[in-house]
Amino acid sequence: MTKSELIERLAGQHAHIQAKVVEDAVKEMLEHMATTLASGERIEIRGFGSFSLHYRAPRIGRNPKTGDRVELEGKYVPHFKPGKELRDRANIYG
């Protein structure tokens, strides 16, 4: 599901709310989540999961085109850990 599909579905389920208001709310929520993660804070949504940053240590990689060795710096990457309810619901289809 894409962001625009999410907005369409939410707007369809809540016909009394204008689609533009739903779009603005979704964009604002995602922006706030990104800002929170960028500041190093953890986000926990009970029943859904948690978002945090994990550190990737520096390593030696390879340029896939040339095969040359490339030094990659350490960096923080977003990480999502699903909650129990989400895992249980996903296993219904698995």
Curated annotation (Swiss-Prot):
SUPFAM superfamilies: IHF-like DNA-binding proteins
GO molecular function, one term: structural constituent of chromatin
CDD domains membership: IHF_B
Record's keyword terms, sorted: DNA recombination, DNA-binding, Transcription, Transcription regulation, Translation regulation
InterPro entries: Hist_DNA-bd, Histone-like_DNA-bd_CS, IHF-like_DNA-bd_dom_sf, IHF_beta
Transmembrane segments annotated in the record for this chain: none
GO BP: DNA recombination; regulation of DNA-templated transcription; regulation of translation
GO cellular component terms, A-Z: chromosome; cytosol
PROSITE patterns associated with the record: HISTONE_LIKE
Nucleotide-binding keyword on record: no
Record's subunit section: Heterodimer of an alpha and a beta chain.
Family (UniProt): Belongs to the bacterial histone-like protein family.
Cited function: This protein is one of the two subunits of integration host factor, a specific DNA-binding protein that functions in genetic recombination as well as in transcriptional and translational control.
Protein name per the record: Integration host factor subunit beta
